[in-house]
Amino acid sequence: VVVAAALVAVLGFTAITTSWRAVRAARLAASGVRAQFAADEGLALQLNAWPAESLTALPLGTTYTSRLTTQIGDPIAVRLTRTHPLIAWVSAEVALKSSGSVAVVQRQVTRVVSLDPPPLPIIGALTAIGAVHATDLTAMTGHDHADAGDACGPLRDTRTVPAIAAAMVSAPAHAERGEPPFLRLSDTTRVRAAFETAWPAIVARSAVRGAEGNAGGLAQMPGWHALVLSGPQVAVQSSARWRGLLAVSGDLVVGGSLDVEGVLVVRGRLDTRKASLRVRGAVVIASHGNPDVALGDHTRIQFDRCAVLMAMATVALPRSSPFFLWVHPAL
């Protein structure tokens, strides 16, 4: 009798233990699925509210962190790391405590996100839909080179472009250096169409400031930023600096000095005959009416692929094409 009772007790204990383990496994599996869905939701929330300004203010390789909450209240830790001006790694991590257990279920989902900037037609160091007039002392080069202070690092890829891409150029031969030094735009209609397609997106994704007359208070800030100056004629009469994308909706007349690291876009005329203009990156001019671009003795334009990409990243959004996906079921 004692042996029989012991066997019954052992069998009962085994059945209870098996049932408990099955319930625990089911709860852990349910928590894992919930954590996986939460991580996917966190990525979707982050991509929907892309932190362009916060991300582009950081150097390459720096991680931007934030915390989000799903619709049912699960906390999510999100990390964004830029490894390239137009590429970011986005990771969402979720840790949930399983119901009725001390175990914690963790899930991490990582995606490589490509950023898609507006299709601004950057063909040369200076791209102009119109005629470009330069002096003997104007210097423009499409030869890209990386140095120790480069935002993308001294070992980045380089690219050589034409010094000037325009419908017509009136400039001394030594003012242009590139391959070729001058590229004639035989079909300006297509270039203008590309510009007009990109312009609304640039305005929508940039800070806009009314600047009719003198564009005062233009100072370089940490990081890279996008700004649109709006006015029939914008004048720079003092010393001004900008890093990122600087766009002008109207004519730009430089009477003082303007230094731009990134991309300078003018939807109007550009006149630098009485001033100093230095650009490391690229310049795009799409004028209406009088299409002439007048450059002075102190105009220096140096093509820089990294500066162009960093500037365009300030107005870029995550691409809607499929992403590469890695799932880590357990950390």
Where are these regions (language model features)?
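N-terminal segment of the canonical double-stranded RNA-binding domain
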Residues: 1-3, 310-324
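Aliphatic-rich helix starts adjacent to a transmembrane/signal segment
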Residues: 3-38
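Generic hydrophobic alpha-helical segments
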Residues: 9, 22, 46-49, 53, ...
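Active-site-proximal helix/loop capping residues that flank conserved catalytic or ligand/cofactor
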Residues: 13, 36-37, 44, 124, ...
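Short alpha-helical scaffold segments that flank and stabilize functional sites
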Residues: 18, 22, 38-45, 49, ...
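Low-complexity, Gly/Pro-rich coil/beta segments used as flexible assembly/activation regions
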Residues: 33, 37, 41-91, 180, ...
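Short, ordered "entry" segments at domain starts
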Residues: 81-208, 219-311, 323-331
